[in-house]
Design a protein with these regions (language model features):
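Conserved N-terminal alpha-helix of the aminotransferase class I/II PLP-enzyme fold
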Residues: 35-78, 101
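Pocket-edge structural micro-motifs
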Residues: 22, 75, 249
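N-terminal "arm"/small-domain region of PLP-dependent enzymes with the aminotransferase-like
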Residues: 1-53
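Conserved PLP-enzyme active-site core in the AAT-like
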Residues: 3-9, 29, 50, 65-68, ...
């Protein structure tokens, strides 16, 4: 069985996918010929690296929905956004405070920029072994001694645990540091008041969300939100240029 046959077999299985991506293979739109949508940066299809038309409109709509300064669409996942966000906040050799349960892309950013990591540890549920939230008291204790360029947390976690981002943001900003939140599993928060507040609403500076995890978007679709002017848009956009694929997939 080749890959095409395997995917066709999976698609025909009568099973509900209790996993990513968020569209659950629901067939929200019909695309009989995917090749018809696969085009390069010709005049009529806009350019993700210099959006002026439909892509710019999409980002403006997202900015209004999420209440941000800027929202940048990503086609190579939250990993791209995390690398760009940390690069925009730090210079090579800086100290960075990160939650020990962060995504591996955070550690890749530490490696690429030769950053000095200092860890904050989540509490652990003794019965399940699941990591709980990061306490604001622990963040305050750690950053008082380290004066990091930025603090990076994951909220919600893979298991859905949310930290008190509002309290943490206040502490981080009192120390003239920046707060980056990996909200990859919380892109749906803004769509109902029954969900927790987004990290943007609670004062984080840069927030990364994976639209494909909990919303009806194709795999690798993500967004980087610039939620405050503490981080220059020019720096964010510069590092997105470096991290984004030069050949974009529009589908």
């Amino acid at each position: 069985m080749n890959l095409y046959e395997r995917l066709m077999w999976t698609a025909k299985e009568n099973r509900y996918p209790m996993h990513m991506p968020g569209h659950k293979r629901a067939g929200l739109f019909t695309m009989a010929n995917p090749y018809a949508f696969d085009v390069t940066e010709i005049d009529d299809t806009d350019n993700l690296h210099q959006p002026e038309g439909e892509i710019l409109w999409e980002m403006e709509q997202m900015k209004q929905k999420y209440g941000t300064k800027d929202s940048y669409l990503l086609v190579n996942g939250s990993t791209c956004g995390i690398l760009a966000a940390i690069s925009a906040c730090c210079h090579p050799g800086d100290t960075i405070v990160i939650a020990r349960n962060c995504h591996r892309s955070v550690y890749h950013a530490v490696e690429l920029l030769s950053l000095k990591p200092v860890y904050v540890y989540p509490e652990v549920d003794k019965e399940t072994g699941i990591c709980l939230g990061i306490s604001s008291e622990e963040v305050k204790r750690v950053i008082a001694d380290t004066k990091p360029a930025c603090v990076v947390l994951t909220s919600p976690t893979y298991e859905g645990v949310v930290s008190n981002i509002r309290a943490i943001a206040e502490i981080v900003h009192e120390e003239n540091s920046l707060l980056v939140v990996d909200e990859a599993h919380g892109a749906h928060f803004a769509w109902s008041d029954k969900f927790p507040e987004t990290a943007m609403e609670q004062g984080a500076d840069l927030v990364i969300e994976s639209l494909h995890k909990t919303l009806p978007a194709l795999t690798q679709t993500a967004v980087l939100h610039r939620a405050s002017d503490r981080v220059l848009a020019e720096r964010v956009e510069h590092y997105l240029e470096i991290g984004r694929a030069s050949c974009r997939e529009r589908v």
